[in-house]
């Protein structure tokens, strides 16, 4: 059964069950700021599930195009190397919005999969999983479907917390959630792997083909599971996976759709068609994601979605280069894709020329730097070592347009570790330079001469407001239309503008069907707030009456982290000393980053004490009070102030019981107990005398602690320790044993070197004035040096050149007895040899080392040394 037929069968089946066939939404989620790309069938129905939107139907079915590349869900590095990872895939789904629930969802899935009228998959090839506490779903499978109990697997909380399970779905920390039931297909005992929940579950024998999510509860901020008044259903079945089942193949790349694309890739690159060639699969996958993204309006750029697209294109082009194709080829595959998928997705046909042009332009642009960049990278890789430095990776990115994951991909092929942390340091330094250059421009770029903004956000999360000004492309306009990016100024705002290290609020400004998504809030002038974002629907005009609403979840997280920062500041001064001053901060919903003046690293004991003091203040649950007062009165309270900061005549003083008093204009919790758990997760130096501390709070801190606990358990298992207390002793014993073995190995190598050296000197060529040894031996660079030093020390007239090859790289070491260095110099000798094997080197007259890359030329080089030395002795 062809993939295209499967797609149609699925939609037809659910249409016969009263479902409305809904067209796939765009890969660009226009109404969900939390998503980079559409990555699941339910994305377009998220507001329906949350109760914010109503549809004229209560049952729906879709074939949804999805992309997983960039962001939280990123399959990019695995694509081409596994049977089922893709950047683009199709998710078949059926949905119930308060209509049917578990019974019908399970019966529908079973009928479609096993009925002779539809897919007719043998029932004994299928297995179901249910959440451990979901007796209702278990009994439906057992008593109504008739599945044997041994093929119904209960999966419990296997991710470290209550309801953290492969079989319990959650939209977020709060909101709709519920158990799920998954259907697995058995690819046969000849393939390794076990059933879900077994130690071998990561194998490829049992593959999930359908997931039925039962949205049954609404989880509140206290973690309580409250039953939803109208439970709903969200299901998903990967089209490529079920196609592999129906076409009796194991890898998704073996299905009809991919087979034709793979042959097209081989045709355009000139490479032989081999299923085991990862580069063919990479390119075949990437032409799908790139073409569909461009069709949905994404173009290659250096930011956001456009940069993810650029990364995918350049990865495909690099794999073409690897296959021997240096000319633009990628765009030529669009026609083949249109032939395969244009019937189901007419936008591919409609925009074929635009897609081809965009891809060709990007290919041509990258071709200008690809060869030079590859040469730089190859040169860095052949120098040896197990790590590629962050500076090189950044240079490839910044100068030659190599995305990080492209370089990491190449390193992976060579078993070399990319220095991601070093690359990030270079990136952060570049961002800091950019921020410094833009700091004035950011506040002054929008012209405005109207009334000031009245900030209501300390006490209100929602205001009724009037639009005072609108901006698009930095210019004042009278209206914003759907899809426009811009800024809005309103008279009353609940949105906090970025200041004092706290990021700006996000949320929505709306009126009826007109909706502006606020993605950032910045000060245009000292007392004028600009809400920056996108008009997601309708139109916004100057003078409109609107409702402005802050995103509560993100605001609450910002408040928790900001209040925790104040407590941490005070605790740091108490623990480290009064010399500690704030040098910078960044408060976001995810964490708080705090820079302080301190001459040395903060010790583990000091960090623990700071954490204890902050959590003690949180447990006290004291009120957080803010008051506006004169600077004179503020000074009398002992409030902490930032050195060099300019303050007005009146200031806002924030007091947290007796724990902290500080000047601050930010938003904060009502009581310290609202912060929840506080945990410092990193500490390090960023400049001379400046330390950076990062901390997290609330559920983020809990998740971090749970991850550490899981890591400890993994270490215990790996070291075969009995308890946590035994782990350190096990590791220390292992390290001591390894050190002893290293010493023993070094001693053995030294003995071998002495024996080998004596034999070499016995076989030396007599040149009259000198004895010449020119040979290749098995040794590393350190051993070569030791042998050469030993030989020249035993003779008054020795000229030595020893070579070794390790992992394809040539090591050379030359030595000359000191009485001969007036005529023959070791540095000249090693340079002469290194140049012939593609390397360079040098050193002292009596001892020198070098390296090279062309091991094939080594025998000829060693043969040529006799004539070179002989000429020097004349």
UniProtKB/Swiss-Prot annotation:
A Pfam cross-reference name: tRNA_SAD
Main location: cytoplasm
Keyword Transcription regulation: no
Cofactor stoichiometry and binding remark: Binds 1 zinc ion per subunit.
Catalytic activity: tRNA(Ala) + L-alanine + ATP = L-alanyl-tRNA(Ala) + AMP + diphosphate
HAMAP family: Ala_tRNA_synth_B
Name of the protein in its database record: Alanine--tRNA ligase
Lineage: Bacteria, Pseudomonadati, Pseudomonadota, Betaproteobacteria, Neisseriales
